[in-house]
Amino acid sequence: MSKAKMPIEVKKYYKRELYQYRKNKDILDDIIAKKEKANTRNILFLHRRIENIETVISKLNSFEKEVFDMIFNQNCDWLYCKTVRNIDKSTYYNIINKCIYLLAEEEGEI
């Protein structure tokens, strides 16, 4: 993982994308299940974002995947992660930053 500096706006954008992953996946599943008439461009864009995040998840090791699930799917803060799994604050934020960096790399931002 490179130490490339990324603008704060870009970092916030990709962090928001990671938090919206589960919601976006549910929206796409609903559209497909109901066979709604939706804009094809929007469906493709949503599908591409979901695939990129799934690629990021596949690059993580098992511990990081577990922490990823706690952070982005269960919306657990650092203190909860420390209490439940004894995850250090630096580890918590390192995993967040690693996911953001990998997602930016997948999107071609870096």
Feature locations, PLM:
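N-terminal interaction/assembly modules
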Residues: 1-59, 107-110
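A short pre-motif secondary-structure segment
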Residues: 67-68
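Helix-turn-helix DNA-binding module
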Residues: 74-91
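DNA major-groove recognition helices of helix-turn-helix
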Residues: 92-106
